[in-house]
Amino acid sequence: MDKKYKLACSLTGNIFYLKQMLLFKEMNDFLICDVNARLNEKGIWCNPSRYDIEKAIRSQVFDKIFKKKLKIQNSFTENIEKSLKLKVLNLVGLSKKAGLLEIGYDKVIKSLKNNSIDVVLIANEDSKLEGAFLKIIDDRKILLNKTFSRSEISKAVGYKNVLCVAIMISNLSATLNSDFYKLMKFKLN
């Protein structure tokens, strides 16, 4: 990521790459989180930590920043997580349409050995595949993720009973990596 796109978090003051942050806006007195924000959009850029966001809501930090009393839905943080998951799954589906997706164990293993992928998704119901992939991945910079269920991955790619998929190295996989960062950082807390 380019260093010129670093910004201080409006909640904590910590420095993050802009692509790793979430954009919060005020719309009709409601606080909204735009997970699909472009880098040039205006609003409050914050780190994607659920803990920091919930703490800011309790302390009314967003009210102070926007200088008005904001309405915040009870399910605000759950909606952010759902939106981040949906964005990732949509990118997986888009990578299939673009011809950048390997589906199935054999194809993923072959692509891992050829160093042509940098994201691997494994259904969270499967316990055996992770070990097999970890042996091949070693110290390479490949994102291995078990966030989604078999049905979620299957629905995203349009097939039934998909246990694993891999995204080939591309701009799309770089975007997917930054969106996974946001999702994982949000889920950690």
Tell me the role of every PLM-derived stretch.
Residues D29, A98, I109-I117, S127-D139, ...:
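Active-site cofactor/cluster-binding pocket
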